[in-house]
Amino acid sequence: MCILVREFNRKEEKYQNRWRIAFILCMVLGCLPKAVYFPMILSCLILGKEKFYSKKDAWIFKGIIVVVCFALLASFLLPVLSSPEQSSDTRGGDTNGASQLSYILKQPFAYVVVLGKNVIDTLQDSFMGPKALNSFAYLGDGKYSALCAAFLTGVALTDTYGDKQTKKKTLDISTRIAFLIVFIVTIVFIWTALYISFTEVAEEIIQGVQARYYLPFSFFVYLCIQNKNLKNTISLEKYQLCIMTISNAILFREIGQIVLVNKCL
C-alpha cells in the first residue's frame, strides 16, 4: 500500500513495471495468511490514465489486478464453502461454520444489523483505543491512549510542511472516498470471517476481532484526513525532532509504568 501511496503522490511519473510487480507480490504475500485483506488490492484501480503508458497498458494492468483479487477471494471463500466445518475455530466456543453461513444466507438483513452494530460499537477502540495504539501484549495496555490518539491526529493534520508540494502530496477527494470504500469492504470481510469461524451460531456479539486487524490500513485512514489548506511553517528538522521527542516521552512513560512499576517494584 505504501507503493500505491507513492504513485498517487507522484502524479507526473509513470507507474513503472517494477513497482507494479512489487505491489502485486507484496499484496499477495500479505494476504496469504489472512485473505480477508484482498479488497485492498483494488485500490490501484483508481489510478488515473496519466500514470500509464497507454490506454491498453492501463486496461491490462487493471485486468491483472481484478484477476489477482478474484484469486485471493477464492482462497478465502472456497475452504468455507467446500468444508464449512473445517473453517470453524473451537476456541470461539460451540462454533459451526456451516450453520453460521446458512444463518447469514437465510437472514441477511439480521446479519447486516449485527455486523453494523458490532463495527460501530468498536470502531473508536479499533482505531484510537489502547489495543490499537499502546498495547504491550501480555503486559497490559498503557494509560495514555487518549493522548496517543490526539498526538497521532495532530501529526496527520500537520504533516504538510507548508511547501509547494503540499497540494500534490495530499490525496484528492475522489481518491479518499475510494480508499474509504475499500477499507469499509475490508472491515466487512474481517468481521464476517470471524463471525463464521469464531462465533457461535446466531450470536449478536461477534467474537475474535482485534484492533490489530485494522493496522494494515489505519495509516491510510489518517492520510485521508489531511488538509492541503493547513500549512505547517515549522522547519522539517525541528518538526521531526518535536515528533520524535513527544513519541519517545509517551513511550518511555508507558514502559516505566507497565514494566518497571508494575513488574519490577
Stretches with model-predicted labels:
Residues 76-83, 160-166, 190-202, 253-265:
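Juxtamembrane "helix-exit" motif on the non-cytosolic side of transmembrane helices
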Residues 1, 203-225:
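Hydrophobic/aromatic-rich transmembrane helices and adjacent perimembrane loops
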Residues 1-18:
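Membrane-interface transmembrane helices that cradle and orient dolichyl/undecaprenyl
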Residues 47, 72, 84, 235-265:
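Transmembrane helical bundles and short interhelical boundary loops of multi-pass, membrane-embedded
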Residues 21-27, 54-78, 177-185, 242-246:
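Hydrophobic alpha-helical membrane-interfacial segments at the cytosolic entry of transmembrane helices
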Residues 35-163:
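Membrane-lumen/periplasm interface segments of specific transmembrane helices
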Residues 15, 52-61, 157-184:
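Membrane-interface helix-loop-helix junctions at transmembrane boundaries of multi-pass membrane enzymes
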Residues 18-35, 40-46:
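Membrane-interface alpha helices of multi-pass inner-membrane proteins
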